[in-house]
Amino acid sequence: MSLLTEVETYVLSIVPSGPLKAEIAQRLEDVFAGKNTDLEALMEWLKTRPILSPLTKGILGFVFTLTVPSERGLQRRRFVQNALNGNGDPNNMDRAVKLYRKLKREITFHGAKEIALSYSAGALASCMGLIYNRMGAVTTESAFGLICATCEQIADSQHKSHRQMVTTTNPLIRHENRMVLASTTAKAMEQMAGSSEQAAEAMEVASQARQMVQAMRAIGTHPSSSTGLKNDLLENLQAYQKRMGVQMQRFK
C-alpha cells in the first residue's frame, strides 16, 4: 500500500458515510494525483461543507495544505486553525510541543505514527495546529503519520460508539436504526439507478421503501416490523445490477 493510499484510507475512515464522503474521496484522489492545484478554491469548498465536524474539516484542510503546492505567503485559514487548537487546553498544547520535538527527529511515516499513537486526540490536534501555523516544521511523511494516528484514535472511538448502538438490546433504537439504514440504502439506489430506462424498476422499489419508512414513522409500528428491510432492498439492488450486467458482491 502506498503512503498516499494509506493516508486516504485513514482520513476517509472518520468521514460519515453518504454522498459527501464520495465527493471528499474524489477530491482526495485528485489532490494526491496532482490534478487539483487550486488550494484556495479547495479550502473554500471544504469550509462550506455541511455535516462534517470542525475537527474533520481541520484534518482535511491540513491534508490539502500539505499536499497541494501553494504560494509561500498564502494565508492560513481560520476554520482549520480553530479546529486544530486542542480545544484551547494548555495541557494539550504542552503535550503537543513535546510530541513535536519527537516528530522533528523522525523522518518516516510509520515511525511518526507509532510515536503519535501514544498521545491523546487533543494533543495530536494541537500538534497538527503547530505545524499548520508554521510554528514548527517536520517532514511531510512525519506529518502524514501524525494525521493517520489522529484519524485512528477518532475512528476507534466512533467504532466503539457504533458497536454500542448495534449491540444495544433496546428494541426502539434497533428499530429506528434499521429504518434509517433502509432509507439510506433506498437513497443510494436512486442515485445509482441514474436515468436509464431500465432504472425505472429500481427507482420504484427505492421510492416505495422510503414511503414505507415514512409511514412506519408516522403511525408508529412494532419494533420488529423493520427486520430485514435493508436486506430486501439490497437484494432488489443486486437483481437490478445483474440485469444491467454488473456483478457485485453484497454491500454488507
Swiss-Prot record:
Query: What's the domain of life for this entry?
Result: Viruses
Ranges for the region named Membrane-binding are: 1-164
Residue window of motif Nuclear localization signal:
101-105
Q: Name one GO cellular component term.
A: virion membrane
Where is the major localization of this protein?
virion
Listed A to Z, the keywords are: Host nucleus, Membrane, RNA-binding, Viral matrix protein, Virion
Q: Where in the cell is it found?
A: Virion membrane; Host nucleus
Q: Report residue spans for region: RNP-binding.
A: 165-252
Asked if the keyword Protein transport belongs to this entry, the reply reads no
Which GO MF terms are attached to this record?
Answer: RNA binding; structural constituent of virion
Gene Ontology biological process terms, A to Z: viral budding from plasma membrane
Describe the protein's quaternary organization and the partners it interacts with: Homodimer and homomultimer. Interacts with NEP. Binds ribonucleocapsid by both interacting with genomic RNA and NP protein. May interact with HA and NA. Cannot bind NP without genomic RNA.
As for family, the record states:
Belongs to the influenza viruses Matrix protein M1 family.
Function according to Swiss-Prot or TrEMBL:
Plays critical roles in virus replication, from virus entry and uncoating to assembly and budding of the virus particle. M1 binding to ribonucleocapsids (RNPs) in nucleus seems to inhibit viral transcription. Interaction of viral NEP with M1-RNP is thought to promote nuclear export of the complex, which is targeted to the virion assembly site at the apical plasma membrane in polarized epithelial cells. Interactions with NA and HA may bring M1, a non-raft-associated protein, into lipid rafts. Forms a continuous shell on the inner side of the lipid bilayer in virion, where it binds the RNP.
Q: Return the protein name.
A: Matrix protein 1
